[in-house]
C-alpha cells in the first residue's frame, strides 16, 4: 500500500489527515470494546442463571420420572407443555441488536383434576417452568453469542488500528517528510550552484 503513495507534499498532507482520523476514531473503538466486555460479562451471567434455572426445573421433573410410565399422567404433562406464543423483541446494546424475551404464553392445562392425583399439579407447574426457562436460556445464549461476536470484531479492528494502520501511516509520513527535506536541500544546493555558475560567467565576461 505504501509503495503506491507518491512522495509529494499533497501525499504528505493526505497522510497527515488520514493519521488524524485514525487517532480520533481509535478511542471510540476502544471505548466500545470496553463496554462490550462489560456487556458480554453480563450476558454470560444472565445465560448461566437461565441455564441453571432450566436445569433445576428439569431435575425437579426427573424426580417424578418413574410416574411417566403411567399413560394418564403422561397425557396430563403433554397437555401442559404447549407453547402458544413466544414474544421476542430486540434491544440495542453498544450499537448491536440483541434478542430479549418479552413474554411466553403457554396453553392452559386441560387434564382432568378428578382423574389425576393432587401431586400432578406440582409436576405440571415444574413442567411449565421447565419450558419457560428452556426458551429463556436459548435466547440468553443467542444474546451472548451475538455480543461475543461483536466483541471479537471490534477487538480485531482495534488491533488493526494499533498494530498496522497507525504505525504504517506514521512511517509513511516520516518517509515523505525525509524525502521532501532531502529534495529541498538538493534544490537549494542546485540553486546555489546555478547562481555560482552565472556569477562565474558574468565575471569571465567582464574580464574578457
UniProtKB/Swiss-Prot annotation:
Keywords: ATP synthesis, Hydrogen ion transport, Ion transport, Transport. HAMAP family: ATP_synth_D_arch. Produces ATP from ADP in the presence of a proton gradient across the membrane. GO terms for biological process: proton motive force-driven plasma membrane ATP synthesis. It holds the Pfam family ATP-synt_D. The keyword Acetylation does not apply. This is V-type ATP synthase subunit D. The keyword Transport applies. It comes from Chlamydia felis (strain Fe/C-56) (Chlamydophila felis). The gene is atpD. GO terms for molecular function: ATP binding; proton-transporting ATP synthase activity, rotational mechanism; proton-transporting ATPase activity, rotational mechanism. InterPro entries: V_ATPase_D.
